[in-house]
């Protein structure tokens, strides 16, 4: 069995939830028409990255949720299509009768109008241009979902720079790791990413898809160059640098391997 996957390496605009949702819908419909049954969008694709203090506004989180629902509704008729969308989410709780708002850097798996799974990023970077601990609470869960018989483990960016999240996904049954990202560029960063993800693939014994953002926000630049690694850590293929692209891959069973789709 072959699963065709589309990495939607696109430029999402901070604060334009409606426009970002339409971009995801359009890309997903195009990918579906070309045979893809799994679409991966970057980290926080619904609102753009980094959204910074906009994330502190309840109305902003609500607008993100509305946009996510729009994506789910518009793609509901596409049978068996799973779309991974990065988004912020919030939940209210009470501690000693005091209301506490917790926000998460999350990703949801949308399929036929429903949210099959929602995963919250476990590892929150707080260095250099990152200040995610200001906005988000670390997640504690694991997300493994099935598409056409293949169990996909979902990670978000910094999760893949640590060993534990990948191992937890494998222990939960993952046969393939899908990592959605918004990783700022600097000279040499591409090689650093590949080397760290190679260690993740080797440590888990699983192939790994690195789905990246492209474009810029203020002084932060995202270089695209999404890639896929085999379970042996070998680079199997890479998308364009500094350009939007719908990049297609194929995952094959019974022994799960992933490589660029043949055009």
Where is each model-derived feature located?
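Enzyme catalytic cores with a strong preference for nitrogen-chemistry domains
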Residues: 1-263
């Amino acid at each position: 069995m072959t699963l065709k996957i589309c990495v939607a390496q696109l430029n999402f605009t901070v604060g334009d939830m409606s426009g970002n949702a339409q971009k995801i819908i359009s890309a997903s419909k195009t990918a579906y028409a070309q045979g893809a049954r799994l679409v991966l969008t970057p980290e926080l694709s619904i609102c753009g990255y980094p959204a910074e203090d906009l994330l502190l506004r309840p109305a902003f989180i609500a607008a993100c949720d509305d946009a996510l629902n729009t994506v789910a509704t518009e793609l509901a008729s596409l049978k068996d299509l799973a779309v991974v969308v990065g988004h912020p989410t919030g939940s209210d709780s009470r501690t000693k009768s005091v209301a506490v708002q917790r926000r998460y850097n999350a990703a949801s798996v949308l399929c036929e109008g429903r949210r099959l799974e929602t995963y919250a990023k476990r590892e929150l970077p707080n260095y250099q241009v990152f200040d995610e601990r200001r906005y988000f609470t670390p997640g504690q869960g694991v997300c493994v979902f099935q598409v056409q018989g293949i169990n996909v483990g979902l990670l978000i960016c910094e999760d893949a720079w640590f060993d534990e999240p990948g191992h937890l996904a494998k222990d939960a049954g993952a046969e393939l790791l899908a990592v959605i990202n918004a990783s700022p560029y600097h000279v040499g960063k591409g090689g650093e990413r590949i080397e760290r993800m190679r260690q993740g693939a080797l440590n888990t014994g699983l192939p790994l898809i690195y789905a990246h953002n492209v474009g810029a926000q203020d002084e932060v630049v995202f270089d695209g160059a999404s890639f896929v690694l085999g379970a042996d850590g070998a680079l199997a293929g890479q998308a364009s640098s500094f350009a939007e692209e719908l990049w297609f891959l194929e995952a094959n069973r019974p022994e799960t391997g992933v490589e660029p789709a043949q055009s």
